A protein has these predicted regions:
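Basic, glycine-rich polyanion-binding accessory segments appended to enzymes
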Residues: 129-203
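Short, aromatic- and glycine-rich surface loops/edge beta-strands on solvent-exposed regions
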Residues: 125, 208-211
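Well-ordered beta-strand positions in beta-sheet-rich domains
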Residues: 26, 85-87, 181, 220-223
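Conserved catalytic-core segments of large NTP-driven translation/proteostasis enzymes
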Residues: 1-123, 127-134, 139-149
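Conserved beta-strand elements of beta-rich interaction domains across eukaryotes
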Residues: 34, 72, 199-201, 215
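Charged, surface-exposed alpha-helical interface/stalk elements
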Residues: 183, 201-206, 216-220, 227-228
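Short coil-to-beta transition motif at edge beta-strands of beta-rich domains
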Residues: 60-67, 165-172, 206-207
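Conserved small/polar residues in nucleotide/adenosyl-binding loops
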Residues: 229-233
């Protein structure tokens, strides 16, 4: 009863985003799997599966794709991240095999990747796009801090004000399905630089959230859009 009125109110407050089918294809990876059972014969092995939400554009079977940040490559004392290159062998959404999937909802993507790469959600938090359409990979973030007025509490905890960031403080960063930890390397007024332990792949202007460890839990303290703006001390 009155569902039409409820939907109208929701649309008026939180409009459905414009999901163009012709835009740059972008998918947030939330899960990744190895679907092969123990004892399977080599000829029956299947490639890795990734699952998530297409947020822009569309993808089709046969598309060449990149998954970033990808895999960690160690060269002596230096570490770099290398995007994974592969192709889409199959798409499934709602239990149905598809030739093309568009933005909105969840889907699973079959690839020829080594299942060892995708097992146990190892690719969770990564981003999938076509060659030349991949967002930047960020190992450092320069933020114009937008801290909340109060820290969100639960249970018997008391809400309190949020103190400014401190040099070398460790924060948790969330960007879409990705989670990383960053160390505050520089602060100036309401701006700060963070060095990330794990890089994130995100479009410029996309929003990240910041959480601070309070006791044994992480508490949301602020947010900021990703930007190329550099912090000058």
């Amino acid at each position: 009863v009155n569902l039409d009125i409820l939907i109208e109110a929701i649309q008026g407050t939180i409009p459905t985003p414009d999901r163009s089918k012709d835009g740059v294809g972008l998918m947030y990876v939330a899960r990744s799997f190895d679907v092969n059972r123990p004892g399977i014969r080599p000829e029956g092995l299947k490639g890795g599966i990734i699952g998530g939400s297409i947020v822009e554009g569309s993808f089709s079977v046969g598309d060449s794709i990149l998954i970033a940040p990808g895999r960690r490559v160690q060269n002596g004392s230096k570490t770099r991240w290398e995007p994974l290159r592969t192709t889409i062998e199959g798409i499934q959404g709602g239990g149905i095999d598809l030739e093309t999937a568009h933005a909105g909802g969840l889907c699973g993507i079959s690839t020829p990747l080594d299942p060892l790469t995708t097992k146990a959600d190892d690719l969770s938090g990564q981003v999938m796009a076509r060659e030349g359409e991949l967002p930047p990979i960020w190992g450092e973030l320069n933020l114009n801090l937008q801290l909340l007025e109060k820290m969100v509490a639960s249970g018997t905890e008391e809400e309190g004000g949020i103190r400014p960031l401190q040099p070398n403080e460790m924060l948790m960063i969330n960007s879409a399905t990705a989670t990383s930890v960053g160390t505050v390397s520089a602060i100036k007024a309401k701006r700060a630089s963070l060095d990330l332990r794990l890089p994130i792949c995100a479009k410029e202007g996309s929003r990240i959230t910041l959480s601070r460890r309070v006791g044994s839990r992480w508490r949301l303290i602020g947010h900021d859009p990703v930007s190329y703006t550099h912090l000058t001390l």
